[in-house]
């Protein structure tokens, strides 16, 4: 177990050592960007540290409607609703969806979308897709809800959804796009850029604002009727609102986000080039580079740590899950950082 007294950026101070940090998230690196931190400070001075009232109360803060309008536009949906965390947003979405039909979970769906403790499918995803299409099309008297992630950061995979075109009945499709929003698509609109437009799929998108944007908060976007129903739920009315300063900083940072997204894409491309002939796995050009597992002593994690390079390696999403070795790239990294990582991976034999 490693400890630090500082928040990591491209590096992290650990036990008196300044180590390269290839772990965590905050893909755009905004949490360490001076301009973004200045906007957060300005937002705090303008709005304080919280909005001290329920969003269902008789006094409303117009800032929330501004960010919800901007997010629904970005995500190409009719309406959006923001929460104080991505987990809360996902839980609100799934607790709404459970009343819309039988939940059909995709394999390895993130725990944020779990309704209680669902029995997730154990088969591979393609088999699950075939069975799901057959089940929905063969049961015209039933209502179904498809539940899935759009991006799996543990396997560095972007899931495809073109198979939704094969459905002959209308379904609600609840998708967690936490690792897509801000990263994928020409304007950072996320996975909606490649989701199929079909009359039988009604999308309800949920996402954390932390993974790309470095903000504690979450969003659910979809059809206006679904969002209106969510606003009548205790998840919305009884929870503390998104910190206003976070909403302010997000609304003021459009150009900065695009700049940092371009830097991130350049860094991803550079490390893809360096690792092209290695066992590093990243087929979709995500910020997540999957590293092979070895039984060596020392382990790859310890080998890199001894050389002041920290990668991601821990059991997730559950304590008994197998640790996954990953190198996470952000917009903050320099080419020399990735060259150093590549050098040590080569020395280890990756």
Segments the model singles out, each with a brief description of its role:
Residues 83, 93-113, 133, 264:
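Conserved PLP-anchoring active-site segment centered on the Schiff-base-forming lysine
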Residues 172, 179, 184-276, 281-283:
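Active-site C-terminal subdomain of aminotransferase-like
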Residues 1-52:
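N-terminal "arm"/small-domain region of PLP-dependent enzymes with the aminotransferase-like
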Residues 265-272, 276-308, 331:
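Conserved PLP-binding catalytic core of the aspartate aminotransferase-like
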Residues 37-85, 268:
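Conserved N-terminal alpha-helix of the aminotransferase class I/II PLP-enzyme fold
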Residues 125-174:
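Active-site phosphate-binding strand-loop segment of PLP-dependent enzymes
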Residues 57, 307-328:
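Conserved PLP cofactor-binding pocket of PLP-dependent enzymes
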Residues 30, 34, 41-46, 62, ...:
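PLP-dependent enzyme catalytic core of the Aspartate aminotransferase-like
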């Amino acid at each position: 177990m490693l400890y630090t007294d500082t928040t990591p950026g491209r590096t992290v101070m650990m036990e008196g050592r300044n180590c390269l940090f290839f772990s965590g998230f905050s893909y755009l690196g905004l949490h360490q960007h001076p301009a973004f931190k200045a906007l957060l400070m300005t937002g705090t001075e303008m709005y304080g540290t919280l909005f001290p009232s329920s969003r269902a109360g008789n006094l409303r803060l117009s800032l929330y409607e501004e960010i919800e309008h901007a997010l629904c536009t970005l995500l190409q949906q009719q309406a959006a609703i923001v929460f104080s965390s991505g987990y809360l947003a996902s839980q609100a979405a799934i607790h709404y969806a459970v009343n819309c039909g039988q939940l059909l979970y995709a394999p390895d769906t993130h725990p944020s979308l779990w309704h209680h403790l669902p029995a997730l499918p154990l088969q591979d995803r393609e088999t699950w897709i075939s069975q799901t299409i057959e089940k929905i099309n063969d049961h015209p008297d039933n209502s179904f809800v498809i539940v899935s992630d759009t991006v799996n950061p543990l396997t560095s995979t972007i899931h495809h959804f073109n198979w939704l075109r094969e459905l002959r009945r209308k379904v609600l499709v609840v998708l967690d796009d936490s690792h897509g929003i801000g990263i994928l698509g020409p304007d950072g609109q996320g996975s909606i850029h490649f989701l199929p437009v079909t009359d039988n799929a009604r999308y309800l998108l949920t996402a954390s604002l932390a993974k790309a944007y470095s903000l504690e908060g979450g969003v659910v976007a979809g059809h206006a009727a679904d969002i209106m129903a969510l606003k009548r739920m205790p998840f919305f009315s009884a929870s503390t609102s998104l910190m206003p300063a976070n909403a302010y900083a997000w609304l003021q940072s459009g150009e900065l986000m695009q700049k940092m997204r371009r830097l991130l894409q350049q860094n991803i491309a550079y490390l893809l080039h360096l690792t092209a002939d290695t066992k590093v796995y990243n087929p979709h050009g995500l910020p997540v580079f999957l590293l092979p597992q070895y039984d060596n002593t020392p382990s790859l994690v310890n080998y890199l740590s001894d050389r002041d390079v920290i990668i991601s390696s821990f059991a997730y999403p559950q304590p008994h899950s197998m640790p996954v070795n990953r190198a996470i790239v952000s917009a903050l990294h320099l080419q020399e950082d990735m060259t150093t990582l590549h050098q040590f991976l080569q020395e280890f034999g990756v």
